[in-house]
């Protein structure tokens, strides 16, 4: 049985900027001068006009411009919108506009806002994830236990550093290498995700021993017209492990482009279908690894071999092994403040899920009936508890995962705005906001809002699933006080580009806000 997933467009490289650069850029943008402005009381009519527009697609509109998108499909779509002024120590946020703000919606990746807010507050910005190697001192031959704790940033480079540490201690041969998968308990892959998603790199399994984001990359190159696309593995060694059923084709320069890659569930077989134009750029594809534990050990053996360290038997255990064996090598992840950048700015699902499980693992001792829960379920309990402590209404959301990839998540715009408001009052507020994409500058918003008044002024988390689009975050209008907002659309037949463009128009409308004096009659 093969499960297919789709990639239609080549994603442009995303710009990673330092935290300080992003924060300063957000605060120090020049004031945008415009004569086209609106009062807070005009937000509702302006949004209604946007949703009723009916003309042809264009690029992101400037503030005050009407888009040209046919939006007749919005008649049956569900919109959830909540716009508030940013609260301060002395004043609560004022609601400027609400449309079904308390209703449940599928949030897509906006769910990451809840996960990362709870993690940052509970674990601290300095929290790191440690991968350890322990030596069994009770045996003469060298037996090592490799303890993974779900570091999503671990790559082959870090495995090389671990191997160097072992070599520096004089280890030349390992009789048994045990991969310890017991830190995260629960099913792999995620049972809350759709079968098509778990085959793609963005839906890679989350376990204790994560390496290279548990995905393998390849490039699909167009050849001469009529010839199949050439498959090039990012790691040539993978070509020896996989068989490819290539039914793709190179087409002329005017034909449509699409690529479908399916992975067989029972064997290392990829099926490639679709077409790319002759002379065009290659299409990058990431495929989820089906056996992440074995993949980790296999690649660690390669790193050990590079240090002339021989390995005998390799095993994987999912059973906790409480021993007093000494730690002889270790490597740590970057701090949580850095991990959040990849999670929110680049909308990395695996990072979000690993952070969720870290929350659960760290709090396991304090949770009642923790043994009956998976580590992910424990993490969700901690998120709920932490957000409640921060003032988020407990009934305003129901989470099934930490990333938003599950279609069982239910989140109201009010829950997102309450979270954004709460975290803005905490000492870690600057770190949290700096992890978000900046309009026209970085991450998933790098290509949106360019050359508009929102560029550099809007920091928000994006979210996209089929028929779903969301944007929630902060906005500094040039002539009005800072805002917190959440905009979600569900159940729309419109293409993603149309949904995003419409959301962008609503956000751009907010940049035109100004204070208006009330009539005294």
Which residues does each predicted region cover?
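Short, well-structured active-site flanking segments
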Residues: 121-136, 141, 312-315, 429-432
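Polar, glycine-rich mid-to-C-terminal structural blocks
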Residues: 146-251
